[in-house]
Amino acid sequence: MAFTAISLFLAALGVINTAFAQSAVIGPVTDLDIINAEVNLDGFPRQAVLAGGTFPGPLIKGNKGDNFRINVHDFLYNETMDVTTTIHWHGIFQRHTNWADGPAFVTQCPIAPGNSFLYNFTVPNQAGTFWYHSHEGLQYCDGLRGPFVVYDPEDPHRDLYDVDDESTVITLADWYHEAASLIVPPADPDSVLINGRGRQANDTTSPLAVINVEYGKRYRIRLISVSCDPYFNFTIDGHNFTIIEADGENTDPLPGVDQIQIFAAQRYSFILDANQPIDNYWIRVIPEQVGANGTAATPPGLAVLHYLGAPPFDPKANASQVPISVNPLLEQNLHALGATGVPDLDPSCAECNITLDFTFNTPLFFVNGVTYKSPTVPVLLQILNGSFTAQDLMPEGSVYTLPRNKTIQINMPGGVLGIPHPLHLHGHSFSVIRSANSDETNLYNPVRRDTVSIGTNGSFVAIRFTTDNPGPWFLHCHIDFHLAAGFAVVMAEDPMDVPGYVKPIPPAWDKLCPIYDALPANEQILQPEAANLSTYPQK
């Protein structure tokens, strides 16, 4: 992304560009070119992998019930990063279209350079805030990530806000100055980007994102963490929030929140009431990322909330000040809108109550004693070829088969490495019946979402969902460096019914694997050197 000379000049004077342009808006039927290009997002130029040529990628939007037809074209060539690609539409259930879910070697083979693949899926019963990203190797850390919003013309919260459009979408990202495959974890980002703009350490001139508001109006802000690693504490000076959505699921309005802790891949919608004196206010994003030497290694992310009529200058408040929260968002205080209780477990179903024990043994993560290694044949293709049991499905020990139309509970103790990990389940949202920072179980009205932090030492998280969507669904840590080190399993839901449920599978899907397998080794997915995964500090 190039900035004009006048933008840089104004930034040097502490002048904000109130005409800040949002990324392009496309969809629901569109082409999406995946390219290599140089970007300068924080004062440091580097080559990146970009969707639509921008970071973040263009906002893909549609309405509840729409058919999305997104034709992804792979124009990648820079072999310091992956040149094959896949796209995951994070939070979309993909009912009957598991083949379009995106994770490499779970539901498809990667798209080879010079080739295209049409992702064709509908969202009949979903609306909310989602995102999309590469789901192979560490590619999304190199730039392939963007927002995805499904609007609901009959939104039950519609009377709470006046504005909800592309100008109210905020993405939070970590950014690195070298290719992800070369980074040695724990990965200290060089900067935090808000809507694709930020400043590296000691930089005071790179342009910042500006969110424009008008006094007296109410805005639905859609906050998306497209983070590859750290979680963030998000605040806006002088303003509180009313939370109305978590991960594409409506919540009872929760007012008075002054800080949102948001983990990689999570999303929140909140109402911002522009009721403060006309001025400019800092939007602050503090990364919870501690370097290997035990000191904070990444500068805070900054953007500007600009009221119409305020002078075009930086906010007067100290930009380096760390806000003190009085009423931070706590997950257990969120409740699903219209909740009617959580289904009971079937005591006769042994495979319906699963405990996943997470451990780390340099350089790999293990789930119940097994580290995830991608198979050479996608799990979906294995099922379509007649493998239906956990014993038959690869990778060995990492596939759990689940019966259909059952309530499943997954129990996840926290504390591995002493840090919180965001766990994401594909194909479903789930009820968080016990949150990481709570010792209470809520079976009446827990929040529903698709990505949950399992917390630190002593935490215990439990989730429940119903197996009403046959297919192999990835469950993994959304810290991408941890996924690359084996922090994942596959939940194979009702494998025997998958061939009849997941259809029609397009002929182009069948061609992905032969084309990928014919690629030379240097064009297949880059694997981080084992040494790059061996330096996580035990805390």
Swiss-Prot record:
It is found in: Secreted. Its main location: secreted. It holds the Pfam family Cu-oxidase. One of its GO terms (cellular component) is extracellular region. It is an enzyme of class 1 (oxidoreductase). Inhibited by chloride ions. Inhibited by citrate. Inhibited by oxalate. Activated by acetate. Binds 4 Cu cations per monomer. The keyword Endoplasmic reticulum does not apply. Cu cation 2 binds at H90, H133, H478. Cu cation 4 binds at H421, C477, H482. Its EC number is 1.10.3.2. Induction: Expressed during growth on poplar wood (at protein level). Residues 37-154, 166-309, 374-495 form the Plastocyanin-like domain. Glycans are attached at N78, N120, N202, N233, N240, N293, N318, N353, N385, N405, N457, N532. This is Laccase-1.
